[in-house]
């Protein structure tokens, strides 16, 4: 498994996969039964841990690693 992926919590990985599939924050929240604010927090954490700047880079990162 990718070392960068190991840095993420299980929930962060779930959020990452859904965001990379094109889900909106509201859709991720509904799918995972969490608040939109919690989704935003997880996305910010993932971006920071992976040293990415935006959702586009996040999607590219996940696609390159065949997570979606």
Predicted regions and their residues:
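Helix-turn-helix DNA-binding segment
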Residues: 1-38, 65
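Residues within the DNA-recognition helix of helix-turn-helix
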Residues: 31, 42-45
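Short Gly/charged-rich anion-binding patches and loops
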Residues: 11, 42, 57
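Residues within the helices of the helix-turn-helix
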Residues: 26, 44, 56
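Basic, Lys/Arg-enriched C-terminal extension of HTH/homeodomain DNA-binding domains
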Residues: 47-68
């Amino acid at each position: 498994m990718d070392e960068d992926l190991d840095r993420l919590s299980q929930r962060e990985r779930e959020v990452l996969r859904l965001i990379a599939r094109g889900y909106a924050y509201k859709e991720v929240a509904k799918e995972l039964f969490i608040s939109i604010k919690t989704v935003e927090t997880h996305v910010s954490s993932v971006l920071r841990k992976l040293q990415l700047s935006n959702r586009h880079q996040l999607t590219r990162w996940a696609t390159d690693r065949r997570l979606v």
